[in-house]
């Protein structure tokens, strides 16, 4: 599997102009996310175009588990923002609403982290964020 490596971890902290969606990863049958790739891509495109994230990392059951019909899509979105992470995640969910009616009704668990904040959390031994970076799948 193409999980994030330590090298990828450090790429999070390098400035990136615009994230690009890695459709080849989304459609790779080795990853559980391939089953919803066509439904997920419009959401990711909107996210990249409207919110300009540095990176989008998929974690949870669609990355390395066995997603069920009731599974949500867990995303770590790395980006600078003037809003609080919670406010930014709420804005993203609101932007997704029209797609839920026109494309596919996917449920999301969205976590937004500033690159510097994420680096500090990992440096302080934050196991949760470290595991996401180490085991997640970088989608953009």
Identify the residue ranges that each predicted region occupies.
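Catalytic core of pol beta-like nucleotidyltransferases
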Residues: 2-55, 64-69, 79-140
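Glycine-rich beta-strand-to-loop/alpha-helix junction loops that act as flexible
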Residues: 59-61
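Short beta-strand->loop micro-motif that forms the acidic, two-metal-ion catalytic signature
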Residues: 74-78
């Amino acid at each position: 599997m193409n999980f994030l490596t330590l090298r990828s971890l450090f790429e999070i902290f390098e400035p990136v102009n615009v994230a690009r969606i890695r459709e080849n990863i989304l459609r790779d049958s080795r990853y559980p996310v391939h089953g919803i790739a066509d439904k997920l891509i419009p959401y990711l495109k909107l996210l990249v175009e409207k919110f300009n994230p540095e990176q989008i990392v998929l974690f949870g059951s669609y990355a390395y588990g066995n997603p069920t019909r009731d599974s949500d899509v867990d995303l770590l979105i790395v980006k600078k923002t003037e809003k609080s992470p919670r406010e930014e995640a709420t804005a993203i969910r609101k932007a997704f609403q029209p797609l839920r009616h026109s494309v596919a009704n996917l449920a999301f668990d969205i976590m937004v982290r500033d690159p510097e904040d994420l680096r500090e959390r990992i440096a302080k031994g934050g196991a949760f964020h470290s595991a996401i970076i180490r085991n997640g799948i970088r989608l953009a």
